[in-house]
A protein has these predicted regions:
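Acidic, glycine-rich two-metal-ion catalytic cores of nucleic acid-processing enzymes
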Residues: 1-111, 174-291, 306-312
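Short, surface-exposed acidic
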Residues: 107-119, 146-158, 320
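Polymerase palm active-site segment centered on the conserved acidic dipeptide of motif C
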Residues: 153-187, 299-338
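Catalytic palm subdomain of template-directed nucleic-acid polymerases
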Residues: 79, 130, 137-150, 157, ...
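Helix-rich, typically C-terminal accessory recognition domains appended to large enzymatic cores
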Residues: 133-138, 259, 326
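Short Gly/Ser/Thr- and Asp/Glu-enriched loop/turn motifs at secondary-structure junctions
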Residues: 120-122, 285-291, 321-323
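Short alpha-helical scaffolding segments that buttress acidic/His motifs in well-ordered protein cores
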Residues: 75-79, 102, 121-129, 157-161, ...
Length: 338
């Protein structure tokens, strides 16, 4: 069944989506409609709710299964490693629950996965505070998840996170110093886990690509058009930038390289297995955040899942001491697989 987009660009709902004809470097199509590519498009699959009907509607072709595997907390791992937060890197390497570790500090007692509310607080703080987020935003995130906490308590959680993860906090300042150096015309290096070279307006990544800050400048006083602080040109506008935001840019870029390298290894293994041949599909069909999704013949699903987990536990050549891990699933639909 093929549906189309009307002239008013309204999506017509189709009962079944087939994820056969797509690939990791091609655009994702559902029933012939263009809905995703690795760089984003007008419509994407980045925020489908878990257990939702849309996930369930993405099904494998007859005789095939979907294998989905995500690189567990890749941003948190890369952030701890890049900043040199050694104790957190050790927790990741040993397979400890880092959410429970932080929650234990917050509540002053041992927190386990059985303590769902307390672990949720630890998880929200771990995921939300690595890039300089303040207590007010933390409070909102906790409230949205059903944990209503006072101003003072949220301020205390932020202080606990920052004192516990001092190397991450320090890196915000180092990133701010890098901006200052860039504006002054200097070059240098940044990072602990790996050293990233920078020069005015750009930072080089391990894969040879750059994060760019065109026309970067510092304004000592705000005016009608610009805020005080650092900013760079983005299309026709000035975009504010600061140390913690720079770190977020760097960590997300590094995490993307890790996941795309993992995806490349998986795609190569599927090709060696036979790829798309003799009526069989063996193909990476989708990436969502830190997740790789493939379609394979039913009889190869368990074997493929094991292969994906093996490939996604390989440490990058440029980050041999970065502890990576993953979790996979299998299903007839995307919803069943994850």
């Amino acid at each position: 069944m093929t549906k189309s987009i009307t002239e008013k660009r309204q999506l017509l709902v189709a009962p079944v989506y087939d994820i056969k004809n797509c690939g990791p470097w091609n655009r994702f199509s559902a029933n012939g409609l263009l809905v995703h590519n690795s760089g984003g498009d007008k419509m994407n699959l980045q925020n489908l709710p878990r257990g939702g009907e849309i996930r369930k509607s993405l099904i494998a072709p007859p005789g095939h299964m979907i294998c989905a595997c995500d690189s567990s907390n890749i941003e948190g791992r890369v952030n701890a490693w890049f900043c040199g937060q050694a104790d957190l890197v050790k927790h990741f390497a040993e397979g400890n629950d880092v959410y429970c570790e932080l929650a234990s500090k917050i509540y002053g007692r041992k927190i386990t996965k059985a303590d769902k509310k307390e672990r949720f607080v630890g998880k929200t703080a771990t995921l939300g505070l690595g890039y300089g987020t303040g207590w007010k935003k933390l409070q909102g995130a906790l409230k949205n998840g059903g944990a209503d906490m006072s101003d003072a308590e949220c301020q205390r959680i932020v202080e606990i996170y920052r004192s516990s993860n001092y190397a991450i906090k320090d890196m915000w300042r180092y990133c701010e110093d890098m901006l200052s150096n860039m504006v002054a015309g200097y070059s240098g290096e940044l990072g602990v886990g790996t050293r990233l070279k920078y020069e005015p307006g750009k930072v080089m990544l391990p894969n040879g690509m750059f994060i760019l800050y065109p026309e970067l400048r510092y304004r000592a006083e705000a005016n009608d058009k610009e805020e005080k602080g650092y900013s760079y040109r983005r299309k026709n506008f000035r975009t504010k930038i600061y140390g913690a935001k720079v770190l977020e840019n760097l960590i997300q870029a590094l995490a993307r390289i890790v996941v795309f390298d993992q995806m490349g290894r998986i795609a190569q293994k599927l090709k060696e297995k036979g790829g798309n041949s003799n009526g069989k599909i063996r193909q990476v069909v989708l990436t969502v955040h830190d997740e790789v999704v493939v379609v394979v013949p039913e009889e190869e699903a368990e074997e493929t899942k094991a292969m994906m987990e093996e490939m996604m536990r390989v440490r990058p050549a440029w980050a041999p001491d970065l502890p990576v891990d993953c979790e996979g699933g299998i299903g007839k639909s995307y919803g069943e697989a994850k």
